[in-house]
């Protein structure tokens, strides 16, 4: 291979077990930006809320939750809910059934108003899918349903599926296979249909997979006026009579079918898929209209007696009180009987010597008690808050655990005969409060990793985020209205907490503003102004309107946030609209603070033209890559080739100083393959001037999350473990030097990156051997002597070795040395290994 100024390679296997390189160590061949070693700190799977931020209470304001229908595949969707106007709202992703009623007759009418739009919402096209609305109204004798279906395929061909989580990829593949089998119109239609099991085409002579698909029993085309995006209410009526069903849309018959099986019981269920539907005036009557069989609110979306994150106990009564609350809309009422009655939440980790500190708002009559107890109702610690006042009042508590340890639950109890409303509960550990509000073990794990920048608050989270939700007093912050990534974010971790966290871990903040592309044009200027106000809140002096708000929140000095990204993964928006946003937002933001750096999203087919037209409006281009498991070795090679193309485009564009920010990267796995990929990826980036910033994802994840299992830091309510990608990244950063060195020679299957120690005393060689064979590496250099070597490496022996709570060091760091012969250094690089060799001159 020719002389390299910036060297890293994964080359096809040459069958050789030996390779030799010659390093030029007299002077650097280039400068590496340590901002490569950043992380995406997205509010996902409790990374911030109840993760980094040591709030131990979920749903602290006792608001009812939406009904998710099914266990989330990736935790990213909202659920069914009924609003104050008695309008039923559907989820907007995945099939989620909502049961309405069941009937012991085949003769009935179902009527309702329907408002449906078939276009994809923001962040909803990641996994593909069929765009339809269905109502299961009858059953076959075997119990399987008959559906009334309204289907509009217009947007199904406009799905874009980047490499995201494994479940998203699986869902996209399944949707594509089902679409190929499903018999359906190429245009919008109404149909009466049932499920059939069919087999997809196999590959390589293998049988295909069997899957349930919708088969139309009768169908009719739907006009644009009947199926539209204008949010118009339509009247739906389904008339069921024995073996026949007739469907009416806006009082006109649209489709009918005679030939339905007649079951003893029929289940009425709402379904939607990848669209948004709302319903009102839902009513089921007998065929002659004389009897009302169902009317009103489905049971699953009715307001519960107890907020969903809390568990009731005792012999009393409970109800959520609307319109009388400290925070948001609801408070929890507890009426005790003859025993202490209350609500609890767990699990909570009880640590010897720890003190549990918090507060609760209450009103009513009776005595209130808080505490921590085990599953057998044995108290670890408790505190009486005394008799509550008639009006809302804040009660603080501090409960030492003493020598107790174990797993418990937090308890709020009302003593016998009491009648108390509670709201806005919070609890932390004293240790966490002493550290600024952060969970101690997660904070330490982040510090040990040394992320050089933190991209926040997302990610896809940005699309729905409003930064003003997360500033001001904690007790005034409202939680999100919608479920996202398994959580209703409490907004306890906002801008001020994020900046404090960055300073605590010595990391540069990267703020991501939203252009909210799914919003109508008449909101554009306000959306832009919101982004500008956020910049002013962070960087303007206290004499500015928004700087004054920051000062009022306890932070008089500007934060001087340098890096600002214009939203996230904008391929759904399209290049024309997004390019306008980059120009408008970037120009306006630079007028407020000319020192900031603007980051624009790439990943468009038109990136080259985007750079040529608008390169002067931004400083960095943001790209994402999630590699599938099989690409742990080859992925970095392909990425290097891609980054080289961008380097050429930047060079030929109006702003040759643009650099790449690989703002999301990882392998979709949590075993040793992630370590090999991380080492190869970082070597690829260190070798190229064009890559200046990086942010791995996921950063922090709770272990019971249903998907995206590739996080660096993995935690539960009491402990954590780090994954191989964390371990390799930490090792690489601990040996970081900004001085890149060139070398010559064939590297074969090895990934090699060479740098000079910043004090000039040695040479650093970062190595990844992704093969199952050892490779002998011979290193020659222009140094006069070798005084010693150190080799730190991971070589667990198998791709599938993974750390866990039970075995945190399944992938363990090893130490070794190379063989020295004069000025020549020889190292045997173990199979499936990643390590750093230091050659001391």
Say what each PLM segment does.
Residues 20-21, 62, 133, 215, ...:
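Extracellular beta-strand ligand-recognition surfaces/modules
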């Amino acid at each position: 291979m020719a002389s390299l100024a910036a060297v890293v390679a994964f080359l096809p296997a040459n069958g050789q077990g030996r390779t030799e390189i010659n390093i030029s160590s007299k002077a650097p061949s280039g400068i590496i930006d340590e901002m490569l070693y950043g992380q995406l700190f997205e509010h996902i799977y409790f990374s911030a809320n109840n993760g980094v931020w040591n709030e131990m209470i979920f749903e602290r304001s006792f608001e009812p939750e939406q009904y998710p229908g099914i266990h989330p595949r990736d935790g990213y969707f909202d659920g069914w809910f009924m609003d104050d106007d008695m309008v039923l709202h559907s989820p907007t992703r995945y099939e989620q059934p909502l049961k309405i009623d069941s009937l012991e007759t085949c003769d009935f009418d179902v009527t309702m108003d329907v408002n449906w739009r078939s276009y994809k919402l923001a962040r909803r096209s990641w996994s593909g899918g069929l765009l339809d609305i269905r109502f299961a109204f009858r059953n076959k004798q075997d119990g399987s349903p008959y559906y009334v279906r309204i289907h509009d395929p217009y947007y199904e061909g406009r799905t874009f599926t980047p490499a995201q989580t494994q479940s998203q990829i699986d869902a996209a593949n399944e949707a594509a296979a089902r679409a190929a089998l499903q018999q359906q119109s190429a245009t919008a239609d109404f149909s009466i249909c049932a499920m059939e099991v069919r087999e997809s085409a196999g590959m390589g002579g293998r049988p295909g997979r069997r899957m349930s698909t919708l088969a139309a029993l009768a169908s009719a085309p739907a006009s644009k006026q009947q199926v539209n995006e204008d949010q118009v209410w339509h009247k739906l009526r389904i008339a069921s009579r024995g073996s026949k069903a007739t469907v009416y849309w806006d009082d006109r018959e649209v489709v009918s079918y005679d030939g339905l099986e007649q079951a003893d019981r029929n289940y009425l269920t709402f379904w939607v898929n990848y669209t948004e539907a709302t319903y009102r005036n839902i009513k089921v009557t007998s065929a002659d209209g004389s009897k009302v069989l169902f009317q009103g609110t489905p049971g699953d979306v009715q307001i519960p007696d107890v907020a969903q994150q809390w568990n009731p106990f005792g012999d009393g009564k409970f109800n959520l009180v609307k319109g009388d609350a400290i925070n948001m809309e609801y408070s929890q009422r507890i009426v005790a009987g003859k025993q202490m009655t209350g609500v609890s939440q767990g699990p909570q980790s009880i640590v010897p010597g720890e003190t549990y500190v918090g507060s609760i708002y209450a009103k009513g009559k009776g005595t209130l008690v808080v505490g921590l107890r085990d599953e057998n109702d044995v108290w670890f610690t408790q505190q009486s808050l005394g008799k509550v006042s008639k009006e809302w009042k804040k009660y603080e508590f501090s409960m030492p655990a003493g020598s107790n340890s174990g797993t418990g639950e937090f308890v709020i109890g009302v003593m016998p005969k009491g009648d108390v409303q509670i709201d806005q509960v919070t609890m932390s550990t004293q240790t966490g409060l002493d550290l600024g509000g952060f969970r101690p073990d997660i904070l330490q794990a982040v510090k040990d990793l040394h992320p050089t920048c933190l991209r926040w608050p997302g990610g896809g989270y940005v699309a729905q985020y409003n930064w003003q939700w997360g500033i001001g007093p904690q007790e005034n912050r409202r939680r999100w209205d919608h479920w996202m990534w398994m959580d209703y974010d409490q907004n306890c971790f906002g801008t001020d907490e994020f900046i404090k966290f960055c300073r605590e871990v010595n990391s540069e903040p990267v703020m991501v503003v939203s252009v909210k592309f799914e919003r109508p044009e008449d909101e554009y200027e306000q959306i832009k102004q919101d982004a500008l106000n956020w910049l002013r809140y962070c960087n303007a002096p206290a004499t500015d309107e928004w700087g004054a708000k920051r000062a009022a929140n306890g932070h008089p000095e500007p934060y001087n946030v340098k890096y600002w990204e214009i939203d996230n993964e904008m391929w759904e928006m399209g290049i024309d609209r997004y390019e306008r946003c980059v120009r408008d937002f970037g120009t306006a933001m630079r007028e407020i603070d000319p020192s900031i750096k603007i980051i624009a999203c790439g990943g468009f087919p038109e990136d080259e033209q985007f750079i040529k037209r608008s390169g002067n409006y931004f400083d960095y281009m943001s790209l994402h890559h999630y590699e599938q498991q099989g690409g742990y070795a080859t992925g970095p090679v392909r990425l290097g080739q891609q980054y080289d193309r961008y380097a050429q485009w930047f060079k030929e564009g109006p702003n040759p100083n643009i650099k790449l920010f690989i703002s999301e990267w990882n392998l979709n796995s949590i075993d040793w393959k992630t370590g090999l990929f991380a080492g190869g990826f970082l070597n690829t980036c260190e070798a190229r001037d064009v890559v200046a910033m990086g942010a791995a994802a996921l950063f922090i994840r709770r272990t019971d999350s249903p998907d995206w299992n590739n996080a660096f830091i993995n935690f539960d309510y009491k402990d954590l473990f780090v994954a191989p990608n964390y371990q390799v990244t930490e090792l690489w950063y601990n040996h970081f030097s900004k001085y890149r060195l060139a070398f010559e020679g064939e590297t074969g299957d090895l990934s090699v990156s060479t740098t000079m120690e910043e004090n000039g005393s040695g040479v650093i060689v970062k190595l990844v051997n992704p093969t199952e064979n050892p490779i002998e590496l011979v290193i020659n250099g222009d140094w006069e002597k070798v005084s010693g070597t150190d080799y730190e490496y991971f070589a667990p022996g198998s791709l599938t070795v993974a750390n866990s709570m039970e075995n945190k060091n399944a992938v363990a760091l090893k130490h070794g040395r190379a063989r020295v012969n004069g000025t020549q250094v020889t190292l045997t690089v173990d199979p499936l290994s990643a390590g750093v060799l230091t050659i001391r001159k």
